[in-house]
């Protein structure tokens, strides 16, 4: 083999090695974003219309965790007539509020039996009070787990009202759109299923003003609780959904 031929042969070997290295690096990086070595356990806090319904599915898909929306969980347990669902329905039919213990046990049931929760969870709609937060911490401690972040979506009330009065919902999935800020590809139609979108009857300024007042009254102590634990992160939710998502990813990437 001449010198020039040997040189070409070595170059081809180097090229093959570089291709192999690139392939292995891609494989190594690929699963990391989808199945993180460290589990993600986070809570998403925000007033109605702040973007929880947009961001929570992104967290779920990016980190392969389960999205635990407590309202949906409660309805599901009631429909399936589970022991927890039967107990909850009895309380609701009597006009009462479902107890903190029942809600925490519903979350615990998901963590124990929902395969999608094996890498962690994003919790949406709970806790709303400090006692609920304490019970949640206690349940996680029993499982030798703990929260690693609490993200609050921050937005001015008046901007929020203008957002919500244009909100459109896909009833079956909970996917949300907005007539101006995040419109569906076809007006009034869900992008994925082609089914019609609706506007909730309580998405009006008067109702929203009352709901926001309740939200601020409830949330303040819970936020202070998590701030004291060093878990709280605030994100400006007045920005576009993609910018909000980038901010949230930065928080999750920096978790310990």
Swiss-Prot record:
Places the protein is found: Cytoplasm, Cytosol; Mitochondrion intermembrane space
Stored PROSITE patterns: ADENYLATE_KINASE
Single GO cellular component term: mitochondrial intermembrane space
SUPFAM superfamilies assigned to the protein according to its UniProt record, in alphabetical order: P-loop containing nucleoside triphosphate hydrolases (SSF52540)
GO biological process: ADP biosynthetic process; AMP metabolic process; ATP metabolic process
Stretches the record annotates as LID: 166-203
Positions annotated to bind AMP: 70, 75, 96-98, 125-128, 132, 200, 211
UniProt binding sites for ATP: 49-54, 167, 176-177, 239
Reactions mediated catalytically: AMP + ATP = 2 ADP
Recorded superkingdom: Eukaryota
Segments of this protein annotated with the region NMP: 69-98
Gene3D superfamilies per the UniProt record, alphabetical: P-loop containing nucleotide triphosphate hydrolases
UniProt-listed Enzyme Commission number(s): 2.7.4.3
Keywords assigned by UniProt, alphabetized: ATP-binding, Cytoplasm, Kinase, Mitochondrion, Nucleotide-binding, Transferase
GO molecular function: adenylate kinase activity; ATP binding
Pfam families: ADK, ADK_lid
Major subcellular location class: cytoplasm
Free-text function comment from the UniProt entry: Catalyzes the reversible transfer of the terminal phosphate group between ATP and AMP. Plays an important role in cellular energy homeostasis and in adenine nucleotide metabolism. Adenylate kinase activity is critical for regulation of the phosphate utilization and the AMP de novo biosynthesis pathways.
Assembly and binders: Monomer.
Similarity annotation: Belongs to the adenylate kinase family. AK2 subfamily.
Entry note about domains: Consists of three domains, a large central CORE domain and two small peripheral domains, NMPbind and LID, which undergo movements during catalysis. The LID domain closes over the site of phosphoryl transfer upon ATP binding. Assembling and dissambling the active center during each catalytic cycle provides an effective means to prevent ATP hydrolysis.
Name under which the protein is recorded: Adenylate kinase
